[in-house]
Amino acid sequence: INMVNFSYRNSSGYQELCKMVKSGKIGNVFHMDANYYQSWLTSNYWGNWKEEDKWLWRLSTKHGSKGTLGDIGVHIFDFASFPIGKIKKLNAHLKTFKSKGDKIKDYVLDANDTFISMVEFENGAIGTVNATRFATGYKNRLELRIFGDKGAVKIEFDDAITEGNKFMFTKDTQRQLSGKEDNLKWEEIQCEPSQTNFEKFIEAIKNNKNDEPDFYRGAEIQNILDKCYESSEIGKWVNI
């Protein structure tokens, strides 16, 4: 029995959003965008990164850091792709803003601070997946918007458990012969608490039956990250 703790799946709103997309309620998915915003390089929400080792190592490849992509990119790529399906190809750009050679104590500050990416899914949908540690004004913000030909969904939160219990849904009506405008209203869907990854893992052990997200999913996301590094290095689209 195995499981990978993609912690933002603990959001009950996200789980229900995924069910809605997978059920086909918003129709064929054509476009999406996903963002993960942190600001601990521009604020002291989580401590002083210039003085504390627990933050400094995250900025140094020598100390094992894979930068923003490796730290929070793993979460946003799972968050973005789980409801839609497998990513077919991508084009990514990684950026380190600190000056070359910047160093604090033994930490060379050379890990990527920001990444942007364009993705295309096996079902033909396209979109963007981005993350940064320089998002001033956001502590730990996840955003996902998915657009289909029958509707759309979106979810935004800073904490998966306390704020992730809802998502937004819209089902645009086609323009009628009477000339009425399309309905562009969004409906808030409140969701009951759902199982966390930890609860699912304990249940999987009891039942001796694996559940998601498993090691295969973890390896799948890690492969996406590897392709992002490759794409950024060569400056081209790469197949997954």
Where are these regions (language model features)?
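Short catalytic-loop micro-motif centered on adjacent basic/acidic residues
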Residues: N2-N5, T128-N130
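Glycine-/small-residue-rich active-site loops that bind phosphorylated ligands and cofactors
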Residues: R9, F134, E220
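Generic alpha-helical segment signature
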Residues: N10, C191-Q195
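Residues that form or flank phosphate/diphosphate-binding pockets in enzymes
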Residues: S12, Y138, P213
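Contiguous beta-strand/loop segments that form the cofactor/metal-binding neighborhood of enzyme cores
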Residues: K50-K54, F77-N165, Q195-K209
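C-terminal "lid/loop" region of Rossmann-like NAD(P)-dependent oxidoreductases
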Residues: G179-I189
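C-terminal helix-rich "cap/oligomerization" subdomain common to oxidoreductases
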Residues: E122, G164-M168, K200-I240
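Predominantly a Rossmann-like dinucleotide-binding segment in NAD(P)-dependent oxidoreductases
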Residues: M3, Y8-V108, G235
